[in-house]
Regions:
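Serine residues within intrinsically disordered or low-complexity segments
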Residues: 5-7, 17
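Hydrophobic alpha-helical membrane segments
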Residues: 13, 19-293
Length: 293
């Protein structure tokens, strides 16, 4: 049941927990300025550089887990998608551990699977919802180009110039990217809300979307800074290859550099959650409060 009370300048939404299956911690939505997006990027890079071996190893384990899951016949792609929220939470837990000065051990990657039956079940539901949403998105793109883009993304294959030049393929790609934005916002904070706050899966999607909307300026800056850093890294590799007079160097170096950049990016995701939600100091667990300015 929802209770709405107006208390200027804030509106307080209180969810009374009718089901005793979840212990839901009271939390507050924290609105941050746009410049915080830069802080999130810097924090992710700093934590990665403090523990580069641990964070890069965990990221490679993360990638290997999803790659292995995708190898299963027929259900591989869906299984990998369903595991993404839980494994992403593992990387966030590793960042949290590293930010306190501790060394994140490999088993932290499966934190979501060791949080008890109730939260494990909630995380699995979240994974199924993500897989269903992503596959539905791919279904929409298949209506445009006959499934070329979806097959390439989910199954793999060779990209040909002829394929890329097709207008239907290009439209399917752009439609997929446009539809993926709201899907990613729904699930951006959801794994952490389920794991650390005990929020039920569907409600975690709502809270995640609202938090992303309220902190949209900071997230936009965050995304733009990361995009700029990725482009800069690729340009530096290309320039270095040109100075060496070895085009082959660029091809060899691009992949590991991109992996390191991705590892840094995933390390920074935890900070977007940490600064967007604040625990209520009272520590009550009977209800969940979301404060919206």
């Amino acid at each position: 049941m929802w209770e709405l009370s107006l208390s200027p300048p804030k509106i307080e939404f209180m969810l009374l927990s009718a089901a005793a299956n979840f212990r839901i911690h009271i939390m507050k939505l924290n609105i941050v300025p746009a410049r915080t997006g830069i802080t999130w990027v810097k924090s992710g890079i700093q934590i990665f550089l403090k523990q580069p071996l641990a964070m890069s190893s965990l990221f490679f384990m993360f990638m290997a887990t999803l790659s292995f899951a995708s190898l299963f016949p027929f259900v591989g792609a869906a299984l990998a998608l369903a595991l993404l929220p839980a494994t992403t939470l593992g990387l966030m837990a590793a960042t949290q551990e590293a930010s306190t000065g501790k060394f994140p051990i490999p088993t932290i990657l499966i934190s979501a699977f060791r949080a008890g039956r109730q939260r494990l079940g909630a995380m699995l539901v979240l994974g199924v919802l993500y897989a269903a949403g992503f596959l539905a998105l791919m279904g929409v793109s298949s209506l445009i180009d006959g499934g070329q883009f979806a097959k390439l993304y989910l199954v793999g294959g060779k990209i040909t110039q002829e394929m890329v030049m097709q207008s239907d393929f290009q439209l399917a790609m752009w439609v997929t990217l446009a539809l993926y934005l709201p899907l990613s916002l729904l699930f951006w904070h959801a794994p952490a809300l389920v794991h650390w706050h005990g929020v039920p899966p569907v409600k975690s999607l709502f809270f995640s979307l609202m938090a992303c909307y309220k902190n949209g300026a900071a997230l936009t800056v965050y995304a733009l800074v990361w995009a700029g850093l990725f482009v800069l890294a690729m340009l530096m590799v290309t320039l270095f290859a040109a100075l060496l007079g070895s085009p082959m160097f660029a091809g060899v170096a691009m992949f590991p550099v991109a992996l390191v950049m991705m590892a840094m990016f995933f390390t920074s995701i935890y900070f977007t959650f940490r600064d967007s939600f604040v625990d209520n100091p009272s520590g009550q667990t009977a209800a969940q409060t979301l404060l919206v300015p």
